[in-house]
Amino acid sequence: MFLNNQNFENRSSRSSSNINSSETIVDLKNPQIIYKIRLESVNNDNLLNLDLDKSESHTGGEQHLELSSPPKLDKKSKNFNKIHDLVDSKKNKNRQRKKIKTKIHIDDDDDNFRDSNSNVSQTAGDLAISLMRPPKPKVEVVKKLTSNKKSIRQKKVAVTPSQNSASIQSNSPPESISITNPLTIQELSKLICVQETDIIKYLFLKRISVTMNQTIDASIISSVADNFGIAVESNVKENNNGLSSNLDNSNAFYETGNYIKRPPIVTVMGHVDHGKTTLLDYIRKSNNANKEIGGITQAIAAYEVEYIKKDNKQKIVFLDTPGHEAFTSMRSRGANLTDVAIIIIAADDGVKPQTIEAINHIQKANVPFVIAISKIDKAGSNTDIIEQDLLKYNVMSEKLGGQVPIIPISSLTGQNVDKLLETITLLAELEDLKADPTQPAQGIIIEAHLDKSHGPVATLLIQNGTLNISDNLVIGSAYAKIRVIINNAKEKINLAIPSSVVEIWGLSSVPATGEIALAVKSDKEAKLKAIENTSKDSSIIQKQRALNSRITLDTLKNTNSKDISKQISLIIKTDNQGSTEAILDSLSQFPQSKVQLNVVSIMPGEITATDVELASTTNSTLIGFNTNFAPGTKQASAKSNILIENYQIIYALIEDIKRRMEDLLDPEYSEVPVGEAEVSTVFSLANRKIAGCRVINNKLLKNSWIKVIREEKVIYQGKIESLKRVREDVEEIQAGNECGIFISEFQLWQSGDKIHSFDLIPKQKSLF
């Protein structure tokens, strides 16, 4: 029989070993009826020919076939019939969906017949080549690579925690780092080239829960860096308000040789209420001490005084510094500004903490100083004791062989005040103080505030050069084109020479107290330098960041590594930058292990309706210090039900904030021993366990707290509910007597248990 139909040709091509061009006659062992045969004329090349390879071996009587790899057929040709019925069409579609690509079955049931050689392929022990399909076309491989690239990109996006992670991964961590301030997790990540997530994970394993924007102190920074093999060098320097650095970097000046003698700048320092302002009142013939709120100075005040010596007038600039402990930065600033210092010590009070602090500031700044012992007109004053106390702080009077003049004075009667002024001028002459008025102006901001009529206003002490109207100044991140200059006598002037204290208008914003003011050539240059300085956080911003969200290792140890849930949020408006700095310095002294302090905003200016809205949104306490209310503020406060606290004395403000923090504390108790007893026997009464005890020390009280101790371990702590002697209820049992104790929630009494009775006394709430 000649096989010349298309079905058999394709079927044979899949199961035979070779295809030859010659015709072959095959005997069919299992003939089957073939349906739907369509005859067509074909060439000899299309005929199926089976030709056994003569070279194949016949080992063991088994016949091995060598199959040639069939050409890949189009999916459409899986149905070999040109004429389809509905059933065959559906079957082909189902097969295409299954996509069976792993193995070719010779006896596939999708054909309409069985090949006679199918038995051979089934019984053959081995086939010469694999029956697996050939590899897929390259197009499909390209698709796979493309999809892999997409998945890689997706993984990168998922893993990257921030935009700088790629740079962090590419940069190797440094061997050591230097820190000067507390850092946020983000800043630390950039500094040590370690991803934020790795830092947070490490701290979490240490039971320290932080966020990326949270500030951590040097102790935690050192712990993190040590974990990643990085050494830490702490260079936390005392804040001198940027004086030295700004002066060193001032390139607006040049040497001209036109130096002239300038008046000395004298700072008056000392403990609160020791008579600093009273002394200056006497010198200036004024009465500022009685005008000050609370009787204390709360800002640096600058005065120009003319001292007449032997018919010669000599100008002296005095700086009056606050003596309250909150104004440490102001005293430090005064010590750095001054040419000569006066340290006031009250004869009836002696050396106090702020006295010692002032001495340290002056000695560190290497400034000559005079000790003035005030209030010698009071009874009981003893200057010799004060001189002896000063020896502890390396201050030796001229009388004892030292170099520090000590002058007893009375600011009320004026006793020895002239001698004090003469001593100051002599020390100033020894310093040979000079300045060049031909240079551009250079000075320092003593105070600054926002005036509702004139805008930002600053008090400037000119140290060198001359300041003119229309000069361009750069003051930190602020700049100015001077519109008005007002001298110490409240007069408008056109220029100010060295050692002058003036008020200036025309600033772009309120500058920070202690900032250096430099005159530059043009308005454009001033703006550019101000923009450069904007990127550097001011001292006030640094202090606020360090105060807010502050976390230390000590804090976490004291709170058993629990998150601090108690928090007070504050919005504070002050009268000037100096007050702002003083308040932040005071608040930073409060420990935050128990209550977190969060300063949402602190700045000079009036209290406005916007502040009220912010307080309502952030659930903050709105506080004012020596400031006023803008129009509409009180109405907004009443509408939002926001209480505004306004203070005029700084220590009242600080104490009130401290009290608010303490009110949030949970009560703490101390245990006061009352008595001791021992369980002699245990008996039951109406299904209740009663401990028969003998009081061995002091007494037992009904409703008192007790600890039940067994084998030196506390097994129960609670209150005595019932205390009986025989059958009688009693309030207390004295030592040497027996009693019965019942506690409903404790029934596990045993003979020999020790009972320690105590009272819980509430402790005074404290943040420390």
Swiss-Prot record:
Domain tr-type G, first and last residues per copy: 261-434
Protein name, as recorded: Translation initiation factor IF-2, chloroplastic
Compositionally biased spans, kind Basic and acidic residues: 54-65
Subcellular location: Plastid, Chloroplast
GO molecular function, one term: GTPase activity
Cellular component annotations (GO), alphabetically ordered: chloroplast
Compositionally biased intervals (Polar residues): 160-176
Organism: Pyropia yezoensis
Signal peptide: none
Annotated InterPro entries: EF-G-like_DII, IF2_II, IF2_N, P-loop_NTPase, Small_GTP-bd, T_Tr_GTP-bd_dom, TF_IF2_bacterial-like, TIF_IF2
Annotated residues for binding of GTP: 270-277, 320-324, 374-377
Region (Disordered), start-end ranges: 1-20, 54-77, 155-176
